[in-house]
Swiss-Prot record:
GO molecular function terms attached to this record: transcription coregulator activity
UniProt subcellular location: Nucleus
rRNA-binding recorded as keyword: no
Domain of life assignment: Eukaryota
Gene name, Swiss-Prot/TrEMBL: med22
Recorded GO CC terms: mediator complex
Keywords: Activator, Nucleus, Transcription, Transcription regulation
Species: Danio rerio (Zebrafish)
Principal location listed in the UniProt entry: nucleus
Protein name: Mediator of RNA polymerase II transcription subunit 22
Region Disordered, residue ranges: 159-198
Quaternary structure (record): Component of the Mediator complex.
Length: 198
């Protein structure tokens, strides 16, 4: 069981002052409102004329209404002072609020990390499947020579184009050109290697 906190003398005096202001303002509002209700009551004939009595009651109502407004403004100022007092002096509550906010942010961070890890694993699995599909498909091979992925898809699109399907000789010509370029590159490499050895 937590022991009640002991406030310093200055803070204790300040709280007592706040309490006194609260009681005085509430009493002022109640008393002035009661007097306004009494003033609104029509009395019997007195020595003062009715017109004079009406003016006097009217002035009294204005004064008491102003007192009620002043007491209300004082209460609003008291609320502001209490908020400031709590913000500046209630360190346990402030620390508790900070700890609660930190816990909420940590929970949110953990959820985001879990989602990112799950997304990373899914992307890795999909990428692995795409690589397996690419290297095991025929479009990834060209006469025993592996092609880059972009070139393989480009050639696959070329095979499926209407021009290639309508003109087989064009496809054969492209294949022969590719083989010729491969052979020329191989001869060039062999020739350069022979010259270096000599």
């Amino acid at each position: 069981m937590s022991t009640p906190r002991v406030l310093p003398q200055s803070k204790e005096t300040l709280l007592q002052n706040y309490n006194k202001r609260l009681k005085d303002d509430i009493r002022s509002i109640l008393d002035n409102f009661t007097e306004i209700i009494k003033t609104a009551k029509v009395e019997d004939e007195t020595q003062v004329s009715r017109a004079t009595q009406a003016e006097q009651d009217h002035f009294e109502m204005h004064v008491r209404a102003a007192n009620i407004v002043r007491a209300g403004e004082s209460l609003m100022k008291l609320v502001s002072d209490l908020k400031q007092f709590l913000i500046l002096n209630d360190f346990p509550s402030v620390n508790e609020a900070i700890s609660l906010r930190n816990q909420q942010l940590r929970t949110l961070q953990e959820e985001c990390d879990k989602k990112l890890i799950s997304l990373r694993d899914e992307i890795a699995i999909d990428l692995y499947e795409l690589e397996e599909e690419y290297y095991s498909s025929s479009c990834g091979q060209w006469d025993g020579v592996e092609l880059p992925l972009c070139e393989a898809f480009h050639r696959q699109d070329s095979w499926g184009s209407p021009e290639m399907t309508s003109d087989p000789s064009h496809a054969n010509h492209e294949v022969s050109d590719h083989l010729g370029s491969q052979e020329s590159m191989q001869r060039h490499r062999n020739g350069s290697g022979t010259s270096e050895q000599s």
